[in-house]
Amino acid sequence: MGTHALILAGGGLAGIAWETGILQGIADEAPATARALLDSDILVGTSAGSAVAAQISGSVPLRLLYERQVAEDSHELDPGVDIEALGRLFLDAVSQPDATARQKLQRIGVIAASSPTVSEPVRRQVIERRLPSHDWPD
C-alpha cells in the first residue's frame, strides 16, 4: 500500500479551530474516514495546519482537542485590535493616489514594524499550551 498524507493549511487561530472542528465533524459522521485521515503516514501543515498536525499526532484525543477549541476559557492572547480602526489604517496607507505600490507597501510595513507585540517568552508559552508534547520525535 502507498503512503497517505494529510495536508493541513494555515489560517491562524481560526484555521486551528476550523481544521479541528472539520476533523471532529468527520469523526462524528464518518468514523472510518476520520481514522484514515488521522492515521495518515505523513502529516504536513503550514502555520495553523502545523499546530493541528502536531496536536492530532499526540496522545490527546481529537474530541478533547475539539472541546478545547469551543471552551469558554482559552490560553490564546486577545490581540485587542479594533478591526474597523485597523481597516481604516490600512485603507489610508494604500489609498494615497500619488504613491507608488512600493510606497504603499512601505507605509504598511512601517505600521506593522511600529505595532506593539508580545514578548517571545509569552508567545512561546501560548504555542506550548497548544501542543500535546514538547518532546521532539526521533
Model-derived features: positions:
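Patatin-like phospholipase
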Residues: 1-46, 54-138
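Short, conserved catalytic/metal-binding motifs centered on acidic residues
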Residues: 49
